[in-house]
Structures are given as C-alpha cells and as structure tokens.
Amino acid sequence: MEEFQVYLELDRSRQHDFLYPLIFREYIFALAYDHGLNSSILVQNLGYDNKSSLLIVKRLITRMYQQNHLIISANNSNKNPFWGYNKNLYSQIISEGLAVSVEIPFSLQFISSLEKAEIIKSYNLRSIHSIFPFFEEKFPYLNYVSDVQIPYPIHLEILIQTLRYWVKDASSFHLLRLFLYEYCNWNSLITPKKRISTFSKSNPRFLLFLYNFYVCEYESIFLFLRNKSSYLRLTSSGVFFERIYFYAKIEHFVEVFDKDFPSTLWFFKDPFIHYVRYQGKSILASKNTPFLMKKWKYYLIHLWQCHFFVWSQPGKIHINQLSEHSFDFLGYFSNVRLNPSVVRSQMLEKSFIMENLLKKLDTIIPIIPLIRSLAKAKFCNVLGHPISKPVWADSSDFDIIDRFLQICRDLSHYYNGSSKKKSLYRIKYILRLSCIKTLARKHKSTVRVFLKRLGSELLEEFFTEEEEIFSLIFSRASSTLQKLYRGRIWYLDIFDFHQ
C-alpha cells in the first residue's frame, strides 16, 4: 500500500503558499473591483480614496476576530450607526479580495500543468461543444449510461478543512471560516430555492470558487479510483481519503457489497468507463455489464457520504441502456440508435445484398423545455402560440427586429449540431411571429395589415440558415462536401450554457 501514497500525497511545495498577506494588498482589491464591483458605487458609498477604503477593510477584519461583533453582527441592521457604512458592501469587498487571493495558487497550478502537458492552445478545449464530438466518437460503442447529479450542500467546515490541505496558511482560513459563518448563506448558492440571499447575488465569484473547489476535490478522488481500480482491494484499502495521512475512514466501503458478495470485495477493472461533467451534472457511461455500473454508483454514493458527509439519494441515479433511453445533457436529448445501411456487392455473375447495422449518436433539440422557456420570457403561451412582447414595444423597429434576430442566431448557433432541425425551425417560427405581433402592436395594427404594408421580406433573415451560408461558400465544391456542411456542426467558440 505504500506505493499508492505517491499518487495520493500532496505536493509539499504547495504548503508554502501564504495568502493572508495578499488580502492587505491594494492591487488585490483593485483586481476585485475590476472583476465584480463598480468603482463609482464604491466611491459613492465610502466617500474615501482607495487607501482609506482599504484601511476600513483592515479594521473590519480586525473587528471580526473580536468576540463582541459590535459592527458586523448578523442581528444588526445592514447599516451600523457606529460606522455608518453598508455591511453588505464591505462583505462584498472582503469576499472579492478573498476570492482573488485564493484563486492565485490554483491559477498557477493550472498554468504549470498545461506547460508540463505541453498544451499550448487550450482555447478550443474550453468550449462546451467540444463534448459532443467526444460523445459521437465514444458513445456508439458503449452500452449503459447513468445521469449523476453531484449532491450538495457540503458542510462549511468540511469544505474549509479540505481547502486547507491544498494551501497551508492557517491565518487565511481562520479568516475564511469566520467570514463564511458571519456573512454567508452558503446553502443559498447551490440549494434550489426561489429566494436567493443578497450575499449570493453580490458575491457569486467567491461562492462559485468554493463550489468548484468542492467538485474538483471530489473528481480528483474519483479519477484516482478510476485509474487505480484494478490494483486496490476493499479489505485493505486504508489509504484513500485523509489528504494528509491517508490511513483511516475506509471501513465504510466494505459495506458496499458485503451483504450480497461477502467473499468478492475486489475492485473490478473497468477500462471503458467514461466520465463527463458540466457544472453540477455529470454523465457516467460504460461498455461493460450493469453490475459494474452499479458498482461505480455505490462507490460514488459512499464517497460523498463517508468523505464529504453529503447525503445522496441512490434512487435518483438511474442506469439505462443507451439504445433504449435518452440522456439530457447541455440542452440536448442524446441517444444511440441503429442506423441500417444496405450495401450491394457483385462477384462475377452473382450479386449480394448485405445489410449492416451501424450505431449512431442522435442529438435532438428538447422542444418542450424550449417552448416553456419562451413562454416564461413572454414570447408565446404555454401551448407554443406566439404572442407579442409588449415590454419591447417602446423600442425602435430596428431594435425590436435586431433583438429577435439575435435570439434566433444564438439558438441556431447552439443547436446547429442537432440531428433533426425541425424543432429549431418551429422555435424560429414562434420568434418570427412574436416579432411581427410586437411590431404590429407598436404601430396599432394587425399582423395581416402590417405584413401587407411592409412585405414579408422584412423578416426573411429569420429563416437564413447557417448551412445555407456554407452552401453559398462551397457552391463550386463537390456534392459530398456540400452534404457534409448540411449536417451537424459543432462550434468551438461557445463557453457557456444558459438554462
């Protein structure tokens, strides 16, 4: 077991990253202002220059360490008469400074890892559309898929202790713990509630960093299990989790298959397991039997419960066959279907007809969720019937048309990788009629009269498809090349997906 400590132990060079002095540097708060704060609002609220503002922040941090929270008690109002300053504003200042400070060592590690791996151009790898070519290449050869929702929320104390294993700076994390318990409603960031706290809205960068770190820690352990699974046994695997000594807290894993398989407690080799994640949702896919998928399911559940002390619901993790079920990921419904192809071959005077069944990944636009989103944005009703957008009726005709066209371009750009474009045409048709009704409402006219007066050419851009542009560019090319550009196209310039 000593050989595996090499893979688990922490790089000792990271222990010398002291962050506490950075919190009291002017340029850290300047970076924070550039990222998340409005300097004019700061000047308006503070009435001081930058040095005086930083001095007040230092005094606030000093006051946080005192037992009598005279200034920043949660029971007090947002504005304390002793100081006369907004508590939420200063919590935002400190959180932005903490976020910038803590991100520095992780950014340096990321840059060094890219240099060691000799990855010079990683820009395209950041695109979320780069996931789908991976699906097209791997998933037709896989059999089972499982949707895994990463459980939350993790306890603050567990999160801070885990963070301390990476950066050995006790002062910073004493301040971090005190600040989180004093100001933050950590659950409000990642708990699906209608009401989001003021802190979550004004400090998304800081809390998103904490959540992403939790996911990164979970994935580092999961990938270790994935890469070393063929060499470890559950009966003697006391080296997993404590990120300093790694020799404790593993007896819970013995209970995974202890009841059904008391004599078979080995990790099974699974070279075909694939893992993909975006934000809090991940996909596990494998070529092997459902038993191995079930094994990984219970490993993850025990990992969350025993190491992170996060409750996970096993009943919500379903294992499905790719050929029979679709999985929802990044706004697409994807499944693997059989694509029959008939090949006729002739040998001398005899001809043969051979039928081959090829597996192909289908990516389908989820029409019903999109219509619900359009209905929520007041472009149509719940049945998909277009309605006018009265909020935009005060804008100019050019601005109204440009807004609708921009939405259509974004949807077409993102969903151009769909196998079936009819759903996209329907969405664009809804937006087209909604635009016409909005213009008619503005001019106090009917849709028919408005179109008759201006002509249907006014909105013909709604149906200008990107593949038509490609066909114009490659008009002299071969028919095979034209057919290629009429198919699915994945763009590597899309870095975010808004629900």
Curated annotation (Swiss-Prot):
Pfam families: Intron_maturas2, MatK_N. GO terms for cellular component: chloroplast. It is found in: Plastid, Chloroplast. Keywords: Chloroplast, mRNA processing, Plastid, RNA-binding, tRNA processing. The keyword Phosphoprotein does not apply. The keyword Plastid applies. GO terms for molecular function: RNA binding. One of its GO terms (biological process) is mRNA processing. It comes from the Eukaryota. Belongs to the intron maturase 2 family. MatK subfamily. HAMAP family: MatK. This is Maturase K. It comes from Albizia julibrissin.
